Structure formats: structure tokens, C-alpha cells
Amino acid sequence: MTGRMLNKHPDIFTFNELHFYEQLWKQQDQTKKINQFEAIALLNTLFSTQRDGYFHRKADEKYSSESERLITNLNGPSFFAHEIYKAFIEYEVNKHEKKIGCEQTPRNVYYVDAILNHFSNPLFIHIVRDPRDVLLSQKNRWKRRKFSGNTVPFQQTVRQWINYHPITIGKLWLGANNKISLHKNKPYYYVFKYEDLLMNSEKEAKGICQFIGLSFHDEMTKIPNVGSSLKQDKPGQLGIDKSKIDGWKKGGLNKTEIFICQQICKTTMIENGYELEKVNPNLFLLLYYYCIFPVMGFMAVLFSFNRIKNIRETIKRRFFN
């Protein structure tokens, strides 16, 4: 939602989720160069992700001529992968006659240090949301295929269903939000609450613009209502949907899921102003969730092997760093 809002600004171009870091780049690539053919393949993949969509991306040769032209402007014959990524970002921003690129992949939160090293003066916008609403959203994420008009591949729907477990989602939320402590109060890092954006969209949008160094435009709050895991997409309906606040209170999560989430995230929740709900879990359901956790975790890793460059590094960054 924030990416679509920023894309309404005349100076900002919002990319699709490119998933460069983690899926196309690993830490070992920091010092490893690639040749021209590998660079073109990487660019083709990035072009495909942006032009065709993340679910249809591949190293499509239909973009080879464009990739080759871009490569000629770089100092070859070998390159670092992040140099290719940076060149692609700059190319697309200029192509759309914008000044600033917004790369909205959420997992970039695990690669802030790498991004700071790869780009000159990058800015980060970190959105904090009630983990119980995150849990509800992720639990229903597999329904995006239906709500988006079958634009999500069936295999992705299966993967999204497998990825859900209250322990996994709770730990991911905690890991991502604990990253705030590493960069809080730094001039390049801006944090706001998702709920504040919904309740007072213009005020929060102005705060984001001030952080970036741009003026606010009224059109920024007139965004299409799409992308929800709980509702049918309504691209013709513009504005901020305030009904997303406290969605977990309206049903969709059982008491045991809420209990697990709060047990994992409670300290960080309190620090961010989220009140804990008094709930008594179902002990049999609690035991069930803990028993199936290793199985669901293994299946989630299995379904991610062909998507992530270094699964060991990814698990370490998400859960242990």
C-alpha cells in the first residue's frame, strides 16, 4: 500500500517487488564478479520481474537487446551483481522520467547494511503493523489467487498455504522489527505504524515526504484498494481502507494463534504501543501447533529451495541475526 502511495508522487517510481537480495544475491556475491553473459541474464531476470511480474519472471531473452545496451554503459568485462542491480534501478527510474526509485521488497529489511554499501545515500521506510493482523493476513494469503482474479499461480498458492504457521509468522515479525533497534534514529531510517497511516493518511504521507525531501501531493492518498488477503480487489475504488485496523478482532484467528503470537512478540508489541489481549489457549491445539511446527518449517524450506540463492544464509538472517 505504501509503495502504491509513493508511486502517486510525480517524482517517484515504485518498482514491483524485485527480490534481488536473497533470491538473486547472497553475501558471497559481495566479492564475486560475474561475466557479461551472466550480467545480461541477471538483467533479463530483473526486466522480466518488473515488466511481466514477479510470478512470471525468468531470464527472458526478449529483453537481451535492452540488457546489452545497458551493459555497454558499464565498465566491463566483469561486474559485481549489485552493480548490475543498481544500474537497472537507475535505468528504470530515468526511463520513466522520475527522480527517485522505490524498491518495495519487504525482505530488504534483512539487507540494510548491504544496501547502504551498494547505494549512495539510500533511504529506508520501515512499517510496523500489529503482528496479529500480520498473522491474519498471512493465514489467508493463499486466497490471493481468488481475490486477484487468478493472477497468482497455483504453485504459489500452495506455497503460501504451507508457509503459514503462527510460530513462524510470529518469529518473522519479531526478527524484522528487531532490526529497528540497529538503525533507529539514523537519518536514513524512517519508522511509522501501519495503523497510523490508515487513521491519518495525509499526516503520515506528509511525514514520509518530509523524510524523503519532497513535497506532499493530494493524489498520494488516492490509491486503488488491491492486494488484500481478506477482500476482493477493487482497483476502481480509491482511498485508504481503514477497516484493515484490528481486523484480527473481527475473527479469522483462534485464541491459540493469538496466544502464540503474543507470547513470541509481546515485548516488541508493547514497545510499539500494541495492547495484549487476555486469551486462554486451547491446550490440545497449542500442543498440535508445536508438534507440526518442525514439519511445516521443513516443507516451507523445501518449497523455497529453487527461489533462494543460499537457504542457510536466509534462515540465519531472518531468525538469528
Describe each region flagged by the PLM.
Residues 77-95, 109-110, 118, 128-221, ...:
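PAPS-dependent sulfotransferase catalytic domain
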Residues 17, 106, 129:
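Histidine-centered beta-alpha loop that forms part of the nucleotide-sugar donor binding/catalytic region
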Residues 15-18, 218-220:
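Catalytic beta-strand/loop signature of glycosyltransferases that borders the donor
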Residues 139-148, 177, 181-184, 210-321:
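PAPS-dependent sulfotransferases, especially Golgi type II membrane carbohydrate sulfotransferases
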Residues 17-103, 145-158, 162:
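PAPS-dependent sulfation machinery
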Residues 1-12:
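A conserved segment at the C-terminal end of the G1
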Residues 13, 123-125, 190-192:
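Hydrophobic/aromatic beta-strand patches that form the interior of the parallel beta-sheet core
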